Amino acid sequence: MPTVFVTKKDSKLTPEDVLTKKIKLGIQRGTSEAVAIKKEQKAKKYPFELREYDSAPLAIEDLLNGRIDCAYMDELPADDSIAKGRAVKKIGTHGTPTDFGVAVRKSDTELLKIINEGYKKLMADPYWKELQKKYLNK
């Protein structure tokens, strides 16, 4: 899943501006993208001021209320905000996309087989498309 910059719909901010100007950037505390952007900011001396939030929707709220200039989050909550009619837009991606998976001990071969079969059945069912549309805006 890509990580995106989100601004107000009428903002002129660009991804380059985010990395080169002294703006307020909102991130969700404790996420992999928060860890990555903090590390990158320190290494590359990005001038933005980070503001941390308990959730991506809270960052969107502060963005809309003018407390931050941009939010940085996974694409899913950004797409959800846009789908709900919030006055925000994605202005670009940054960083490495995040992949998700299920971890299983090597010795749990039977559990792995059950999980993989479950995924195959779910993705073959038309209900999978409904879930993607409902939760992933696809």
Q: Where are each of the predicted segments found?
A:
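Proline/Glycine/Serine-rich low-complexity intrinsically disordered segments
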Residues: M1-K138
